[in-house]
Regions:
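Catalytic cores of secreted or luminal carbohydrate-active enzymes
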Residues: 171-188
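Active-site beta-strand/loop architecture of penicillin-binding DD-peptidases
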Residues: 162
């Protein structure tokens, strides 16, 4: 249904988000409003005064898709697909992005992060370390889902606990230590804003 200007934007919804986000961010209590938005709607994280929607952050769905496609490839074929890893840099400053590897990517037969990686057992861990290192160096805030830090093998299931015993296995413990080190570097060398 066309709006009063002939477009297909829901003008009332736009005004609702602008108002809601202005009120919430105006409280100055540390509230973050994060948009999971996949349509390339412009200015999601810009202030309403700049004709933005006023969200604090936006999931970078394009980066996530490209990252996962690249990381699933056998390393011998990656040299033909580096564009998957570099394209996100062309728009990385257009919004306040969060690089998300969410629950959506480790359910419904999509595999856990470690099982998305190519290669034999040890190679999977090396590939995931390389991927996380790239992620930490890419512009945007970072968000891993539970179990991704130690190499959870099973897909996420809200009815079942994580396989915490894996964190005691050498390669899993090493991955967890590696992620801890990456996050420590991130805290030391990035601004809090």
């Amino acid at each position: 249904v066309a709006n009063q200007y002939g477009g297909n934007q829901n003008l009332e919804a736009i005004e609702f988000f602008k108002h809601l986000n202005s009120v919430l961010t105006g409280r100055k209590d540390g509230c973050m409003i994060i948009a999971e938005e996949s349509t390339a709607w412009p200015k999601v994280t810009h202030r309403p005064e700049e004709d933005g929607l006023g969200f604090t952050f936006k999931w970078n769905m394009g980066w996530m898709h490209d990252f996962l496609e690249y990381m699933k490839l056998d390393p011998i074929y990656r040299k033909f697909n580096h564009n998957h890893m570099t394209f996100g840099l062309t728009y990385s400053t257009s919004e306040n992005f969060i690089l998300v590897l969410s629950h959506d990517e480790v359910v419904h037969l999509k595999c856990s992060m470690i099982n998305k990686m190519p290669g034999i057992y040890e190679d999977k861990f090396a590939n995931l370390k390389a991927g996380y290192t790239f992620m930490l160096g890419h512009p945007g805030k970072k968000l891993l889902f539970m179990g991704q830090d130690f190499g959870q093998f099973h897909e996420w299931d809200e009815k079942v606990s994580l396989d915490w015993y894996l964190a005691d296995e050498p390669l899993h413990a090493d991955l967890q230590s590696y992620v801890r080190g990456l996050l420590t570097l991130c805290l030391l060398y990035t601004s809090p804003s």
